Amino acid sequence: MHTIAIGLNYKTAPVEIREKLVFSEHQLPEALKKLRSSKSMMECVILSTCNRTELYVVADQLHTGRYFAKAFLAEWFSVDMEDVTPYLVIRENDHAIEHLFRVACGLDSMVIGETQILGQVKQAFLLAQEEKVTGTVFNQLFKQAVTLGKRVHSSTEISSQAVSVSYAGVELGKKIFGTFSGKHVLILGAGKMSELTAKHLYANGAASISVMNRTKENAVELASQFAGTARSFAELNDALKEADVVISSTGARDFVVTKENAADALKKRKGRPLFAIDIAVPRDIDPEIATISDVYLYDIDDLQNIVETNKKERKKEAEKIGVMIEAEIDDFKAWLNTLGVVPLITALREKALQIQGDTMESIERKLPHLSERDIKVLNKHTKSIVNQLLRDPLTRVKELAAEPDAKHSLELFKTIFALEAQIELAEKAEADHAEQSWKEGQRPSLNQGMALRT
């Protein structure tokens, strides 16, 4: 049994390649079933976003699993495997597990620490569960990944610092006002940066948003996104009297807000602070207004410096999270090892019960006078002896399975109890059953492939 992660993302493939390999939401159920029915596949999850398309699979063989995962992508999207292979990254076992944990924690995202990907990982897993294409391994692995992602965001500062210019302005405003609840926002210009900043302010509780733009239609369109109002530049002084926050990005060649009209507006504000964000180049707001009492002015360089500082802080937090991920990988591997010991336990029980059964047959032949009741009593007590003798070894072998050197210890356990023959027969039976299942178009048991491999 092997865990494989195969796919591409914004780091490995340009957008013109990524856009050809995106699963639409309505396609995913069918895609999951088709991937699961591919040879070697035992479990699967598909994670498809604007920045990544990744297949996570549990396969009974590494080589076969890799090949048929790539073949599935090529066939599904009608592309040549040779064309897409250079952009694919394939991770196996520990590396695949680590990658999933990093993705869920936001460490593999374009913006380190972003939280949206955690929800996308969770939804991908839940859909795979609904389509019944996950099993023992992925039910545990993805639950751990989602739980780890939540813990990372709640116990570290990875997602608390602004790493975009638009959101950095919001964070600065919170330091001045505490909250944007009840605050009035004035937007000068209807460009993308103004729109993004306005969205953040609106999401943080701004009471009203007014938009001024040279082109009235653009002002109306942007204002409508926030149930706001479009105003003309002729009303600028009045708007400055009312606004608590000013965002400016007009593209004008001269100052739109001068020290004079700002000073005039401030006289009528009765000491209310004015927070101004100038994200235009060249600047829209006369930097001299920062000398006026109760005016807080920040330009694009101020915001960019904050963003760069915050990015460095996020990288420091990412190092802490790396340690958390390593511990989580160890926990998952310990759990996974306990699955590998199941065939060993089964073989030992079967061997012991076979000995007990043979002994009972011998007793019945040699003591034919025993009553049916006597035989039942003897059978019960000899089975009890077997169970008591096995209790400690079976408890210990489960503990051994969770230790780092489990492979050597379990091999020794198998040798001591001479279980090689039983396990070989069990593995052959499983392999024969799996092959027959593929021929008949059936799914093999999710427990297949979990036999101890040495």
UniProtKB/Swiss-Prot annotation:
Its EC number is 1.2.1.70. One of its GO terms (molecular function) is glutamyl-tRNA reductase activity. The active site is at C50 (nucleophile). Residues 432-454 are annotated as: Disordered. Pathway: Porphyrin-containing compound metabolism; protoporphyrin-IX biosynthesis; 5-aminolevulinate from L-glutamyl-tRNA(Glu): step 1/2. It holds the Pfam family GlutR_N. Residues 432-442 have a biased composition (Basic and acidic residues). NADP(+) binds at G189, A190, G191, K192, M193, S194. It comes from the Bacteria. It is an enzyme of class 1 (oxidoreductase). The record marks H99 as: Important for activity. Possesses an unusual extended V-shaped dimeric structure with each monomer consisting of three distinct domains arranged along a curved 'spinal' alpha-helix. The N-terminal catalytic domain specifically recognizes the glutamate moiety of the substrate. The second domain is the NADPH-binding domain, and the third C-terminal domain is responsible for dimerization. Catalyzes the NADPH-dependent reduction of glutamyl-tRNA(Glu) to glutamate 1-semialdehyde (GSA). This is Glutamyl-tRNA reductase. It comes from Shouchella clausii (strain KSM-K16). The lineage of its organism: Bacteria, Bacillati, Bacillota, Bacilli, Bacillales. The gene is hemA.
